[in-house]
Amino acid sequence: MSDAVMFWTGWGLTGIFSAFLLLASVAPKLARHASAVDPMGKFGWDPELVVAIGIIEGVCVLLCLIPPTAVVGLILLTGLLGGAIATQWRIKQPMFSHVLFGVYVGVAMWGGLWLRSPDLRSIIPLQLG
């Protein structure tokens, strides 16, 4: 695959998952929508933390979109997703649809950066075939 195709495929993947996170996860938290606030008690979190979690998540996603800070943003987002995975697992949510959802998002986000960053590909070379 040419570098240009990898670059634009990586940005496409990053853009799709960033938009998803910002619209489906961050925005409801910042708006204190019931879909974000109500589950907090079930998860064992104080519902008052929903806006702070939304801000942290939003900052992580925005850092992922800025090339010089993308790696730091993804490291922070990976930590946040790890917390979400642990929270879902602790309350015994369904494994493939809920618990592992953070893994799916993380793999897609890291895959997008890997495709668009020759520097990351040199550090983490994947040899297929």
Where are these regions (language model features)?
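Generic signal for short, ordered secondary-structure residues
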Residues: 4-5, 18-19, 38, 54, ...
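Short hydrophobic/aromatic-rich motifs at helix boundaries and adjacent loops
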Residues: 7-11, 31-34, 56-58
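Solvent-exposed, well-ordered loop and adjacent helix/strand elements within mature globular domains
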Residues: 19-49
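Solvent-exposed, flexible loop/coil residues
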Residues: 34, 47-49, 53, 95, ...
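Core segments of alpha-helical transmembrane spans in multipass integral membrane proteins
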Residues: 45-65, 78-79
